[in-house]
Regions:
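Single conserved hydrophobic/aromatic residue that forms the stacking wall/gate
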Residues: 1-14
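Short Pro/Gly-enriched beta-strand edge/turn motifs at strand-loop
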Residues: 3, 98-107
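Beta-sheet entry/capping signal
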Residues: 8, 48-50, 73-75, 118-120, ...
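Short, well-ordered beta-to-alpha junction loops that form the rim of enzyme active sites
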Residues: 8-9, 54-56, 133-135
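A solvent-exposed, charged loop/short amphipathic helix patch at secondary-structure junctions
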Residues: 13-27
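Short catalytic/ligand-binding loop motif for oxyanion handling, primarily in non-cytosolic enzymes
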Residues: 13-17, 58-62, 84-85, 129-131, ...
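Conserved beta-sheet core of the metallophosphoesterase superfamily
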Residues: 26, 30-101
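A short C-terminal boundary segment appended to hydrolase-like catalytic domains
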Residues: 106-160
């Protein structure tokens, strides 16, 4: 990939609480919109931006846009192995919460908060292959892969 790979402890994308148009997490980038815009201004200088994000405990694929709706890049949020994810916290409300995030946040293209796992990333000149791998248990050294979701991200191209 010809561009910039950025690591972030927290989601950079703008997340709103459904219907309220208020920041989801003011202790993350949501609480620092001016600083996020300064970061985006620098990232706009790069041909293609791919952000790897952790500490959300769920899987995400997000398009990043600045305040003027200019495409900045794609953000990949990796799932947790042992930390609580959406289903651990909200149980049967998980599907509704995930659907709400996608509906209310145009930049969120996909999310998964039901399974534990990890993310594999293969970078080539033409694309980034993102594979979210989920396991049936994290309480044993013996586990099975129960699902994997693959996505191809093209340089400087929003996820549709």
């Amino acid at each position: 990939i010809n561009g910039c790979l950025v690591g972030s402890e927290m989601c950079i994308r703008d997340r709103k609480i459904g219907g309220a148009n208020v920041p989801f997490n003011t202790d993350a980038w949501d609480g620092y919109p001016k600083e996020r815009e300064r970061l985006f201004k620098e990232l706009k200088k790069v041909n293609s931006v791919l952000v790897l994000t952790g500490d959300t405990h769920n899987s995400w694929l997000n398009n990043l846009y600045d305040a003027n709706n200019n495409f900045i890049g794609v953000e990949i949020g990796t799932p947790a192995i042992s930390s609580p994810n959406t289903i651990d916290t909200f149980g049967s409300l998980t599907d509704r919460i995930e659907e709400g995030f996608i509906k209310e946040n145009k930049n969120v293209k996909w999310t998964e908060g039901k399974h534990k796992g990890y993310t594999l990333l293969k970078l080539t000149k033409d694309r980034s292959e993102v594979c979210f791998v989920y396991v049936n248990t994290v309480k044993s050294k013996v586990y099975e892969v129960i699902d994997n979701n693959k996505f191809n991200v093209k340089p400087n191209t929003p996820i549709i």
